[in-house]
C-alpha cells in the first residue's frame, strides 16, 4: 500500500496542472463526471475483453479487493487513464455537471481514439485487445511483455 499517500498527492498535482489550480477530483462537475464516464467506458471494454479471453476478472495483480469483481480490469485500466484525461481535456468546455447526450456520444467514441500499440497506429479498443492478449501470453509463458498503448504525439 501507499502509506505516505504519495500516489494521492501526485494525482492532486497532476489533475490541477491539467485542469487548473481550482480543480478537485471527485467533485460533481463537468470534468469529473466526464472523466468518470470515460473511465467506465474503457473499463467496460476491458471487462468484456477479459471475459472473451476467459480470464477471471476478480483475480487482480495490484487490486485485490474482496468486494470488487473487476480487480483485474482496474489493474489494466491504469495505462488508459492518461489517454482518457487528455481526451476529456479536449472535449469538456463548460461547467454543466450534467453530461449532454452529445458529450456522452463523444466520450463513448474514445474507443475509436487513435493510439500506438506494438509500434502501429490502432484504435484504443483494439489496443485493449492487444493488451489482454499480451497479458494472457505473459501468464502462460512467464515472460513479461505487455503491449501498453502510447499516446500519439
Sequence positions of predicted segments:
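Active-site helix-to-loop segments that bind/position phosphate- or nucleotide-bearing substrates
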Residues: 1-153
Amino acid at each position: 500500500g501507499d502509506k505516505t499517500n504519495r500516489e494521492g498527492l501526485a494525482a492532486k498535482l497532476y489533475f490541477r496542472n491539467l485542469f487548473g489550480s481550482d480543480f478537485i477530483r471527485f467533485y460533481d462537475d463537468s470534468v469529473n463526471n466526464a472523466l468518470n464516464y470515460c473511465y467506465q467506458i474503457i473499463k467496460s471494454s476491458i471487462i468484456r475483453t477479459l471475459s472473451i479471453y476467459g480470464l477471471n476478472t476478480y483475480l487482480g495483480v495490484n487490486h485485490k479487493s474482496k468486494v470488487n469483481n473487476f480487480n483485474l480490469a482496474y489493474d489494466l485500466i491504469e495505462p488508459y487513464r492518461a489517454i482518457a484525461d487528455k481526451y476529456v481535456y479536449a472535449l469538456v468546455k463548460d461547467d454543466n455537471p450534467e453530461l449532454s447526450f452529445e458529450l456522452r456520444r463523444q466520450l463513448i467514441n474514445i474507443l475509436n481514439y487513435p493510439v500506438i500499440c506494438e509500434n502501429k497506429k490502432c484504435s484504443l479498443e483494439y489496443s485493449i485487445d492487444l493488451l489482454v492478449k499480451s497479458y494472457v501470453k505473459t501468464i502462460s509463458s512467464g515472460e513479461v511483455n505487455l503491449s501498453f498503448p502510447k499516446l500519439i504525439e
